[in-house]
A protein has these predicted regions:
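Bacterial Sec-dependent N-terminal signal peptides
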Residues: 1-31
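Short, surface-exposed recognition loops and adjoining beta-strand edges that mediate ligand/DNA contacts
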Residues: 37, 63-88, 178, 214-234, ...
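Conserved, well-structured interaction surfaces
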Residues: 42-51, 55-61, 65, 90-172, ...
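Extended, well-ordered alpha-helical segments in internal regulatory regions
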Residues: 164-175, 239-251
Length: 278
């Protein structure tokens, strides 16, 4: 009996120790200040961080669209509904943000919907994703990886930062442009940029992404182990889509034909790159 009690006591001590270590481990991983930069000096470690960006930003093809999952074939495109051409004009609060007669404010109850759940301070909201992308790029650029490896990884990050801003601009127009990791200061403030500045920023990110990914993806695309990752062609295809949005009535009320021509030329020029990427 004494032997059984001793064994039971040792088992309890061991289990408590494991629980304590497990809790400590989880708490440490939740503290982003303890994320050591050495992880970026190893290609696999850096790639895991890039993979997490895919997980946060890619649409889910098996579910309806939501604030953290963009539109898929199974869901309506909520951001594209943010136009009077689609929704019409009414006194309904759900569509009042496209009604030029409605005063948008929290006091009237009519305001642009918080589609991306930013007010909920959720880590996976669109600004949390952008912060994660900026942090990952800073870590990779400051690492000891070869320039070729840096380009492969940073190129993917640039694409997803452009993707996040494309979704924001479709919904809100001009938004703050943030390219560096900011300290979590409640008093910090970043000025809102114009829609034009945002479009130019998105286009530059996509051009840079296409350049950085060219060596790895324009000779038939990624190898079989990396199938499905973004390529130079992916970046240029999104660039064409962004320029069509900029030329559309949503942002081009005067119907400036040069915007349409620019979008056409960019899409036309991207076709050889898309073919080269497989």
């Amino acid at each position: 009996m004494n032997t059984k009690i001793k064994l039971l006591g040792l088992g309890l001590v061991a289990s408590l120790t494991l629980v304590s270590c497990s809790d400590s481990f989880l708490e440490e991983k939740q503290n982003y200040e303890k994320f050591t930069p050495e992880i970026y000096n190893d290609f696999q470690g850096a790639q895991l961080r890039v993979n997490s960006i895919y997980g946060q930003c890619l649409p889910n093809p098996n579910s309806a669209g939501a604030w953290n999952n963009n539109c898929t074939g199974l869901a309506s495109d909520m951001q594209s509904k943010a136009t009077e051409e689609y929704t019409g004009i009414s006194n309904d609060a759900a569509t009042s943000f496209v009604d030029p007669r409605a005063e948008l404010s929290s006091s009237t109850g009519f305001k642009v919907p918080d589609y991306f759940q930013n007010e909920q301070k959720h880590l996976a909201n669109v600004w949390g994703r952008i912060r994660n992308i900026n942090e990952t790029m800073e870590g990779i650029n400051g690492s000891t990886l070869s320039q070729a490896d840096k380009d492969k990884l940073v190129g993917q990050c640039l694409f997803f930062r452009a993707w996040c801003y494309y979704q924001l601009v479709k919904w809100y127009g001009g938004v703050p442009i943030i390219t560096e990791v900011q300290e979590p200061d409640p008093g910090s403030f970043t000025q809102r940029s114009s829609a034009k500045d945002c479009i130019e920023f998105i286009v530059k990110d996509l051009d840079d992404a296409a350049d950085k990914l060219a060596a790895a993806t324009t000779n038939g695309g990624w190898d079989s182990d990396n199938w499905g990752r973004v390529t130079s062609g992916t970046a240029l295809a999104l660039k064409g889509r962004v320029l069509v949005l900029w030329a559309s009535p949503m942002f081009n009320r005067s119907n400036d034909q040069t915007r349409w021509q620019n979008a056409y030329e960019q899409i036309k020029n991207s076709i050889p790159v898309l073919n080269a990427c497989g």
